[in-house]
A protein has these predicted regions:
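Face-selective signature of the C-terminal outer-membrane beta-barrel domain
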Residues: 1-177
Length: 177
């Protein structure tokens, strides 16, 4: 996590009694994610064990001008008139993670090695071979492990894909009295 901010301002009064307060601020916060000692289960044994799933960046800049003026009324009670304006520019960015942190590997589909036939009723030659080696493969049983799909993306925190990586910005302006 890295953060920085800067702010400043000045207050005072004009000769006519109008008080002012001018200020500005800017800042940014960035989170750079890193994962270690984990895998992308859908990539199986070929999975790397550390990932950079992406970053989050938030930044804001604001300028403000506030004024107030106190004047006497005919009722003998002073009235304070306050008014001002504010402008703010802000952005939020989701930075894409590295490819293997969000992509699906071969284990993200049912029967990734083609052990069962297309209609899921009988083993293929490859399936017959693993059965001969001691496997309990049962292609007719939909709960057989060959049909179980594992998670996609780095385990614990899948990375940000291009589909969800973008910079969002907006500006706002306000006046008050």
């Amino acid at each position: 996590v890295s953060d920085f901010s800067l702010l400043g301002g000045i207050r005072g009064s004009f000769d006519n009694g109008l008080n002012y307060d001018f200020s500005g601020r800017t800042g940014e916060s960035e989170i750079r994610y890193t994962l270690g000692n984990t895998i992308n289960p859908s990539q199986g044994r070929a999975s790397q064990q550390s990932f950079k799933p992406g970053d989050l960046i938030n930044s804001e800049t604001q300028f403000q001008a506030d004024f107030n003026y106190e004047f006497e009324t005919a009722f003998g009670t002073p009235v304070l008139l306050a008014f001002g304006t504010s402008y703010m520019d802000e952005s939020y960015e989701v930075v894409q993670g590295e490819l293997n942190s969000y992509t699906a590997g071969p284990h993200a589909t049912q029967d990734p090695f083609g052990l069962c036939n297309a209609d899921k009723t009988a083993p293929t030659a490859a399936g017959t071979s693993v059965i001969a080696g001691g496997s309990t493969l049962d292609c007719a049983n939909s709960s057989d492990p060959v049909y179980q799909v594992v998670g996609v993306g780095s385990n614990g925190f899948p990375g940000f894909s291009p589909q969800f990586s973008e910079k969002y910005e907006r500006s706002s302006f306000a006046v008050f009295a």
